[in-house]
């Protein structure tokens, strides 16, 4: 069952301007250490940060809070599964909100897609609640 959906477009030029104007202060305020390492190693640094920024905005929308109610930028971090597929790791207020959204006996899975084509970066987040292994009972 889908319990949340969010979409966001981010202008890469806006992120370039923020990086130039605020530098480390902007990066430290918005991005996790994992995101920073990933983005700093990319040839298109601003596009990488813009995709992650869009992912956070989309996630906040999917959670139904925006960046309010105790949900902060660094509570949402883009990470990659072993397959390479991107997803979001939630901590703090974002994790608490996700727990409130997830029906008892179900487990939340966050699906994330990222893309960019200068000057835009886009992210879509779908939060799905699925039967957890503990609540799964095979039919006999």
From Swiss-Prot:
Offer an example of a GO molecular function term for this protein: holo-[acyl-carrier-protein] synthase activity
Kindly give the InterPro entries that the UniProt entry links to this protein.
4-PPantetheinyl_Trfase_dom, 4-PPantetheinyl_Trfase_dom_sf, ACPS, Ppantetheine-prot_Trfase_dom
The prosthetic group or cofactor this protein requires is:
Mg(2+)
GO biological process annotation, one example? fatty acid biosynthetic process
EC number(s) for this protein?
2.7.8.7
Q: Where does Mg(2+) bind?
A: 8, 57
Q: Where in the cell is it found?
A: Cytoplasm
Q: Which reaction does it catalyse?
A: apo-[ACP] + CoA = holo-[ACP] + adenosine 3',5'-bisphosphate + H(+)
Q: Which cysteines are joined by disulfide bonds?
A: none
Question: What highest taxon heads this organism's lineage?
Answer: Bacteria
| GO CC list | cytoplasm
Main localization (coarse): cytoplasm
Swiss-Prot/TrEMBL keywords: Cytoplasm, Fatty acid biosynthesis, Fatty acid metabolism, Lipid biosynthesis, Lipid metabolism, Magnesium, Metal-binding, Transferase
The record's Gene3D superfamilies line, in alphabetical order, gives:
4'-phosphopantetheinyl transferase domain
Indicate the family of this protein: Belongs to the P-Pant transferase superfamily. AcpS family.
HAMAP family reported for this sequence:
AcpS
- Described purpose of this protein according to its UniProt entry: Transfers the 4'-phosphopantetheine moiety from coenzyme A to a Ser of acyl-carrier-protein.
* Descriptive protein name: Holo-[acyl-carrier-protein] synthase
Q: Which species is this UniProt entry from?
A: Beijerinckia indica subsp. indica (strain ATCC 9039 / DSM 1715 / NCIMB 8712)
List the taxonomic lineage: Bacteria, Pseudomonadati, Pseudomonadota, Alphaproteobacteria, Hyphomicrobiales
